UniProtKB/Swiss-Prot annotation:
The species this protein was found in: Vanderwaltozyma polyspora (strain ATCC 22028 / DSM 70294 / BCRC 21397 / CBS 2163 / NBRC 10782 / NRRL Y-8283 / UCD 57-17) (Kluyveromyces polysporus)
Keyword terms: Mitochondrion, Transit peptide
Protein origin, superkingdom: Eukaryota
Protein location: Mitochondrion
Main location: mitochondrion
Residue interval of the organelle targeting sequence: 1-22
Protein name: Altered inheritance of mitochondria protein 41, mitochondrial
InterPro entries with a match to the protein in the record: Asn/Gln_tRNA_amidoTrase-B-like (IPR003789), YqeY/Aim41 (IPR019004), YqeY/Aim41_N (IPR042184)
Pfam families linked: YqeY
Amino acid sequence: MNFMLRRNGGQFQKFGFFIRCNSTESFYSKAILGLKKDLKQAMLAKDDLKKTTIRNMLSTIKNKEIDAKDTKFDEFTLFGIYSKLINQRKDSISDYLKNNREDLAGKEEQELKLIQTYLDSLPIASPQEIDTKVEKFLNDLKEKEGTVPMKDVFSKVDWNTLTKEWKASQSMIKSSIVSKYKNIF
């Protein structure tokens, strides 16, 4: 029996029916698609605040992609971008409040909450979870080898395994090690 299959994006069409293929899309690309869908919904609902915030997020992500062409992007990249946008909003809010512009501060606060919801949806460990794991790692290292210089601590870390198991970026783990090292050693 001959079947006519035609590829249509991530789907195959067979006699007018779509068959979804098992895709291996990364979380990064799924998150971008989710942002674009949310942008479309905001445009249809005429929600200007959500629309401009999501456009700003997509623009920042695209600029990051252009700046770092050969870099692999993942959920940790999105975490960094979202965190940067949140910090910008916090700075703007404090500046607006200093200048008695509560209306603009309120708008920035709403944008911050929206970006925070996207940040919370990322499958990464919280800073508190990372700090707890780093403390345990450093205590185990101290028990095994005694006092270890900080430069040697970094060489004892298996970065590929640790970033996947802990669901944390290398930079997040490094900053946690630096802050916790002083307390343990």
